[in-house]
Amino acid sequence: MVRATPIHRYRNIGIMAHIDAGKTTTSERILFYAGVCHQMGEVHDGAAVMDWMEQEQERGITITSAATTVFWSGMDKSMPQHRFNIIDTPGHVDFTIEVERSLRVLDGAVFVLCAVGGVQPQSETVWRQANKYFVPRMAFVNKMDRTGANFDKVVEQLKARLGAYPVPMQVPIGAEDGFEGVIDLLKMKAIHWDAASQGTVFEYRDIPIELVDKASKARAFMVEAAAEATEELMDKYLNEGELKEQEILEGLRERTLKVEIIPVFCGSAFKNKGVQAMLDGVIHLLPSPADRPPVQGLDEKGNECRCKASDSEPFSALAFKIMTDPFVGSLTFFRVYSGVLNSGDQVYNSVKLKKERVGRILQMHSNQRDEIKEVRAGDIAAAVGLKDVTTGDTLCDQNHIITLERMIFPEPVISMAVEPKTKSDQEKMGMALGRLAQEDPSFRVKTDEESGQTIISGMGELHLDIIVDRMRREFNVEANVGKPQVAYRETIRKSDVKSDYKHVKQSGGKGQYGHVVIEISPMSDVDKQHPDVKGDFLFINEITGGVIPKEFISPIEKGLRETITSGPLAGFPVVGVKVKLVFGSYHDVDSSEMAFKLAASMAFKQGFAKANPVLLEPIMKVEIVSPEDYLGDIMGDVSRRRGVLQGQDDSLSGKVINAMIPLGEMFGYATSLRSMTQGRATFAMEFDHYEEAPTNIADTVIKKT
C-alpha cells in the first residue's frame, strides 16, 4: 500500500500548558476547524471530546493524554493536506508523568499560555520536560479576550522565567472585551474572524493606523531572528534590508527546529479567534518526523544504532502508554519510528525478550476508535492483543532487534492505605489496582508485610483521589482510604563503617555457613556516576583470592538489595549508600546461597546502625499566588510549616511567593489557604528533593513505626 500522506507532511505535536490556560478548549477548536467534530464541546459544560474520562468531565481538568488525528490544509485551504497526530496533555502537577511520556514520542509542541496568568509554576515544569527531550515548540497566548490580558507581558515572561527566546509572529488587535483579531507579521495584514460563523469565515484587512508602528517594529524583530539562521540569509538581509516571506519562514523554521527560538501566536480559543492561524504555524514551523534526528537505541550486542524515519527501514516503535478500554481490553499506544506494521503481524518486545502478535491496530480519536490495516514511520496508533507490554518497551522486527532508550519515571512521594469495603471486593480490588498500576508507571501498589494492608503510592493527593475514584467507576470496587502518608527515605552520614557478620547454624546434618565483611559509606557525587549504580545504591565487589567463591557474590548483592527496600531505622527505603564487599570466608559443605544472603543482610543492618543513620523527608517546591493584602499571613503560615522562603515575584495575577516546604506539612494546605485568603489565593507544588528531617520530626516518625 502506498503511504496516503508523505512523511514530510506529518506533524506529531503535543498541546501542553498550565492548568486553566485553555488547552483542552484549544484542542476542541482544532477538531472543529479540521472537520473532525461538527459542534464544539466546552470544558465547563463537561462536553469536551478530548476530556473523555468521567472524572475529567466532572473536574474540568485533563488527566490522561488523549490522542487524535486530524488533517489540515491551511486556513485558506491553499496548502497540501498535512496530517496532525495531536496529544492533549494534562496541566496538573500530579499528572506530569502523562506529559513526560507524551513528550518522549512527539516531534513538536504547542505551548498554550493564559494571557492573564502568564507563565505559571506548572508551565516551568512542562518547559523543563520539553527541554529534556529537545522538543521544538511554539507558543499560543490564549484568552486574549479576558480581563487583564496582556500579550507583551506574557512574551516578556517567556524570556525572564523560562529563558526562552520568543519571536512574536503576530500582534494582537486590542485586548479584553476589545480583542478583535491579530496582525499577521508575515503578510503585514490584519486578520478578523467572523463571530457568526464560529470563526470559520475570516478576512484580511489593512492594519489599523494606531498599530502600524508597533507592527513594523515587531516585524523587523521577526525578520532579524529569521536572518540569523544562516549566513546567506543574514547577508541578504544586511544588503537588502528585507527578506521574502518564504525566506523568513525558512529561517524561523530552521531556528525553531534547533530550539533556538519560540515563535509566538495569540488568540482566544473560546471566542474562536486565532486557532487556525496557529495551525498554519504548526505546518510552517514545527518538524515532521523526517526533520528530527534519527532515534537512538542499542542493538542485540549492546552497540549504539539509529532508526531513520523511513518506511523502508526495519520496523521499530516505542510503547508509551497502556490503557484499559471497556470494549476491547488492553490498548497499547505506540509511536512508529521506522518501517511498516500490518495488523496480524508478529512483533518482538526487545525489553521483555518476547514475541507477540498484534491483533488489531486502531486509530484513536480521544476514546473513539477506527480500525486500520497498517501503520508506517511517524504514525501514532494503538494496538490490541499485546499482553506483556509495559510503558517504555520497544517493539521491533524480530530479525532487526533494537532497544530504544527507556523512559525514567519519578518515584512516588505520597502513600495511603486502601481497603475494600466488603469481603467480596477484595479480589476485585487487587485486579483493579494491578490494571491501574500497569497503565500508570508513577502509581505503585504494595502490601505491607506486617499489617497486611494494601498501600498505594503516587505523585500527590489528587493523583491518588482519582485512582480510588477510577476503582469505583470502572471496576465497581468501593474502598476505604487511610490518611495520606509521606514517603520518607533513610540514609547514612558516616563513611567507611566496617561490619563483620558470620551466619552459622549447626543442627545435625548439613549446616549453614556464610561470612561477609562489608564497608558502608554514603555515595559521593563520583559514586553516583558509577556504571553499577542501580536505584540509588552501589555494590562493589572487592573480593580477591577466592575467599568467597564467585557463585556466592550475586546472592550477597541480592541480600543487600532486599534489605534496603525496608531500612533498619523505620522501614523506609534506603538511598544514597555504597557497600563494598571486602572480605569473608566459606565452608566447603555448609555454605549456600541462602546463608550468604542472610549474612549480607545482617551485616548491612548492623553496619547501618553504626553509620549515623538519618531520616530524609521530601521537600516540595511551592508557588503561591495571592493578592498583596494576604502576604503577611501567608508568609507566617509558611514559616510555621517549616518552610524556607525562596523569594517573591510580581505576576499578572498578584504576588508570587516561592518556598520550599516539607511534604509532611502540606496536607490540607488547600483548605487552609482558602480560609486564610477568602479563596483568592492559589498554589501549586511539585517534588524538589529529599533533605534530612529535623531530629524531633524523625523521632516522631520512628516512634510511629
Curated annotation (Swiss-Prot):
Q: Which residues form the signal peptide?
A: none
**Keyword match Zinc:** no
- Which cell locations does it reside in? Cytoplasm
Biological process terms from the Gene Ontology for this record are:
ribosome disassembly
Ordered alphabetically, the record's keywords are: Cytoplasm, Elongation factor, GTP-binding, Nucleotide-binding, Protein biosynthesis
Name the NCBIfam families on file: EF-G (TIGR00484), PRK12740.1-5 (NF009381), small_GTP (TIGR00231)
Please state which protein family the record places this protein in: Belongs to the TRAFAC class translation factor GTPase superfamily. Classic translation factor GTPase family. EF-G/EF-2 subfamily.
The function of this protein is: Catalyzes the GTP-dependent ribosomal translocation step during translation elongation. During this step, the ribosome changes from the pre-translocational (PRE) to the post-translocational (POST) state as the newly formed A-site-bound peptidyl-tRNA and P-site-bound deacylated tRNA move to the P and E sites, respectively. Catalyzes the coordinated movement of the two tRNA molecules, the mRNA and conformational changes in the ribosome.
Q: What is this protein called?
A: Elongation factor G
